[in-house]
Design a protein with these regions (language model features):
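Conserved beta-strand hairpin/beta-sheet module of binuclear metal-dependent hydrolase folds
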Residues: 4-65, 154-157, 161-165, 256
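Metallo-beta-lactamase
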Residues: 5-9, 103-152, 195-198, 202
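Active-site metal-binding motif and surrounding structural segment of the metallo-beta-lactamase
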Residues: 44, 55-102
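Structural motif
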Residues: 45-47, 75, 137, 161-164, ...
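Active-site neighborhood of phospho(di)ester-bond hydrolases with catalytic His/Asp-centered motifs
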Residues: 49-51, 73-81, 101-104, 163-167, ...
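Active-site-proximal loop/helix segment associated with metal-binding centers of metalloenzymes
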Residues: 148-152, 168-193, 238-241
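FMN-binding flavodoxin-like domain, especially the glycine-rich phosphate-binding loop
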Residues: 175-213, 217-220, 262-276, 288-390
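Short N-terminal or domain-adjacent regulatory/targeting segments
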Residues: 212-241, 315
Length: 390
């Protein structure tokens, strides 16, 4: 059965939802699923903006057949070539062999790499700032390289103010998009903050003209557009959303966890209302990365393991580096029963491998567990965190 939605009078959502996929990109848990968005423009000429993952191809074709109602598909606009959006290209070409493909040079190169038969079809290669008319609707193509692949572009329908934004402004989950927006951006495109800043600057002249944002994942945005755009601006500058403390602990037998909880209590006693605590072993790293983008301060509490950093904590550090987390104030708590090494190793990683991370001099160092004689260290660290908030 077809399932379509009107975005505007002439633009239809014809995509598909996937509630079977458990790991997005085979890496990120998506318990609420994901949507693959595709948009069909009905004008003097018809145009499909991107396709969907292979798993949603049948639904896409059924939706398109319903909206087209016997009309041919004239154009296929490809903004992004990642397989979860390009997976149905070949079926589109088989169903509508006379369709003209509109995209850019790098995208056509990638289509050939993925073995799509583009050489057998008419193509229109566009460049930055080019325009194209489908009749009533005139669109402008704006290149957005590395948001988050090199071939990415966005398409702006100047007639109705619709921005087809590729993966930008997308979210995990089929519903309640705002809830998952930070987690999506920080993990999927978070590494490329400078490139997001570039596309935001390019879009500066048309921001007041945008009435709809149509991403390739998640809901279409029709309200509070500037709120969402400002969030993207903050995240892509690697600025925290708010002053607060995120405590991440690695604990084998509960002793490091107990110390982390004690620090959280001290911070709350001193008036800090925004404190979040996470077990690095039981929290998916994508959630940790998302929360790291939210808070100004980070506490890393790790047991020493085989004379190194606990593996799950090390993995978290590596992910922070890979996704370009920066400009945070960090406090360290370390534990070990005979060789307390984790603190120095974490500090070395933060100093040498990451950008603009301010590591507080104050530290809590424990031998097996937190004892009363370490209460002063705990109090001093809590005071240092609070003072650094000023």
């Amino acid at each position: 059965m077809y399932s379509v939605r009107n975005v505007t009078e002439d633009v239809y959502w014809v995509g598909a939802n996937d509630h079977r996929l458990s790991l997005f990109e085979n890496a990120y848990p998506i318990p609420r699923g994901v949507s693959y968005n595709s948009y069909l423009l009905m004008d003097e000429k018809t145009a499909l903006f991107d396709t969907v993952d292979w798993s949603g191809c049948r639904q896409l074709l059924e939706n398109m057949e319903h909206v087209l109602a016997g009309r041919p598909l004239d154009y296929l606009v490809i903004n992004h070539l990642e397989p979860d959006h390009a997976g149905s290209i070949e079926e589109i070409l088989l169903r509508w062999p006379n369709v003209v493909i509109i995209s850019n040079e790098k995208a056509f190169m990638m289509m050939r790499q993925f073995k799509f038969p583009v050489d057998e079809h008419t193509i229109v290669e566009v460049k930055e700032g080019d325009t194209f008319s489908f009749g009533k609707h005139l669109v402008t193509f704006v290149f957005a390289p590395m948001v988050h692949w090199p071939e990415v572009m966005v398409t702006f329908d100047t007639t109705d103010g619709v921005l087809f934004s590729a993966d930008a402004f997308g979210t995990f989950g089929a519903l309640d998009g705002k809830l998952f927006a930070r987690r999506y951006l920080t993990n999927i495109v978070g590494k490329y903050g400078p490139h997001i800043q570039l596309i935001l600057k390019k879009a500066g002249g048309i921001l007041n003209q945008i009435k709809y944002i149509c991403p390739l994942h998640g809901p279409v945005w029709r309200k509070d557009l500037m709120y969402f755009i400002q969030k993207y601006d903050t995240w892509s500058r690697y600025e925290p959303e708010e002053k607060g403390v995120m405590i991440v602990y690695a604990s084998m037998y509960g002793n490091t966890e107990s110390a982390a909880q004690a620090l959280a209590a001290r911070l709350c006693d001193k008036g800090m209302t925004k404190v979040a605590i996470y077990d690095v072993s039981s929290t998916d790293v994508s959630q940790l990365i998302s929360e790291t983008f939210k808070y100004s301060h980070l506490v890393l509490a790790s047991v020493t393991y085989n004379l190194g950093i606990y593996p799950a904590m090390h993995n978290f550090l590596m992910d922070m580096k890979a996704l370009n987390v920066q400009s945070r104030t960090v406090a360290i708590m370390e534990n070990g029963s005979w060789a307390i090494k984790s603190g120095d190793l974490m500090q070395k990683f933060l100093d040498e491998e990451m950008k603009n991370m301010t590591v507080l001099n104050e530290r809590v160092s424990m031998a097996s567990s937190l004892h009363e004689d370490k209460a002063f260290e705990l109090e001093t660290l809590a005071d240092a965190i609070m003072e650094s908030m000023q």
